[in-house]
Amino acid sequence: MARSAVNPGYLIPVLSKALDILEVLHRYGQPLPLETIHQQTNIPKTTVYRILKTLVHRGYLAHSPNGLYRVVSRPKKTCFGFGKQCGEMPFSEAVTASLRHAAVRAGIELIVLDNRYDPATAIHVAEEFVRRKVDLVIEFQIDQHAAPVIADKIAADGIPLIAVDIPHPHAIYFGVDNYRVGFEAGDLLAEHAEQTWSGKVDSVLGLDIEGAGSLVQSRITGSFQAIQKRLRHLAPASFVRIDGAGIREKSARIVAEFLRQHPRDRRVLISAANDTSGLGALQAVRELHREKHVAIVGQDCIQEAIDEMHRPGSPWIGSVSHEAANYGPALIRLGLAILQGATVPPYNFVEQKLIRADQLRAPAAEKAIPPHRDLSGTTASLSDCERA
């Protein structure tokens, strides 16, 4: 092996000798006696003997009854494959960062590939995980039609699968209770209508992600149910679902179209399936100067949403934090439990936390919101949501 120039004072002689011995054994590729190792390395025989005994003791070498030494095949490091939703989505990147950190702490090799919010790419990523023979796949992709294709390819190779936030066949589900997080968002919107507009509402707009399937769509279902529960007088025609696809640009366009078609609506509630879609709605509201006519609640609690909630007069009144910082440790624990043959629930829900703009803007906001207990048993404060 080529050696780069280095100050001899930085070298550890006995460690260099141990590496020389290992290189000889690797080069020969067969068991060798002490004498051969001594001759090939020119290291004193007593030193060779002591190094060999140390390497045997630590499990790097085996010593056979006939006096030969051989390299022990080290167990392969457990490897997880993670198909992240999209490198341009803040929540996806927060989950990825959490998972990377947790994998390092657990000694897990983590291969991260980007699904790019695209079903064809997600299928290709799944094929790559199969080719690399990972021990377990954690899949975070949005398309319900790609889900069975991805799941079948992974299951055909006998690889366990965890699906994040969007269910997949053959997979253990991990993520939020979509209906409940939607219900929390809707309850806050209804409270805002009661306190600000005396309970009067002209329209309730749900920004859906149709491509993600019925479970993710239940976020909007939950929002509508919460609003109907508190504002029982609202007519069914007041509730409108449109597909923002979880994308800012599309959401901005369709919300702008809706507001132009309803110029007399002065009390509009918007529940967004994710913050990215909600921020698109906010863009449209500002461009049309309708800030005083609208209230928005999102999902994920990304940093831009937190910043918006700090802004006085913003129509953004809250976001449900899915606690992305907790995803990594919980996913690693779940993956290891699956590989160890433990019985795990088919649905594994993470905790969520409603973050309200009125609390963030209040003095000593961090004291106003009590800490919560995360999945790893440590206490997390509002700053965890802000980092996510």
What label would you give each PLM region?
Residues 2-75:
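N-terminal helix-turn-helix
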